[in-house]
Amino acid sequence: LHPATFYPVVQGHEYSGVVMAVGSEVTVCKPGDHITARPQLVCGKCNPCKRGQYNVCEHLRVQAFQADGAAQDFFVVDDDRVAKLPEGMSLDYGAMIEPSAVGAHASNRTDVKGKNVVVSGAGTIGNLIAQFCIARGAKNVLITDVSDLRLAKARECGIKHTLNITKKTLKEAAQELFGEEGYQVGFEVAGVEVSIRSLMETIEKGSDIVVVAVFAKDP
């Protein structure tokens, strides 16, 4: 159980749905519209919120962690968190907007073009980060995990280089793939100490490590 999650709680923070009813002053959507919404709940009153830095709200809550999520028949969403889906986009694709936004933002935190990249953690977010790095022109992208299933899914998504770290070390795999050039960008998406330590020990000096995961325990 993740210590940042308040139980009992309804799961579901990556979602889309159909609007059933709206308040009298709502103009961003109407009944029947297909929408998605940001899962972050902010106070709007603290200093970070007043500066527009809602991601570091002093009272930040996230659906499915500190507030109930979308895995229920009906739930209420504030209109300032809503985004209408483009015409013809399926609800399945709509539910991928939030994790895709995380992947796009993370991959844009440092310049990956022409560089060798390691993504530690092949879950949904890690998979998407690797795809965005490829799209942004990374030279080579290696994604690692302990799950062969996740790594197989990564290959299905076009990520050629995968590593199960229970079968070979990152140091060995990086040497084989990148040679003396090594790698210059690492993304920590697993949220465990051994993952970030492995990146720190194997990445080229003077390079960038982007920490994306929320750690259950301090590394």
Where are these regions (language model features)?
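Conserved hydrophobic beta-strands of the Rossmann-like cofactor-binding core
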Residues: 35, 117-119, 186
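Conserved beta-strand positions in the Rossmann-like core of class I SAM-dependent methyltransferases
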Residues: 20, 141-142, 210
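Mid-domain Rossmann-like dinucleotide-binding core that forms the NAD(H)/NADP(H) cofactor-binding site
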Residues: 89-168, 172
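Glycine-rich beta-strand-centered segment in the early N-terminal region that forms part
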Residues: 2-47, 81, 86-88
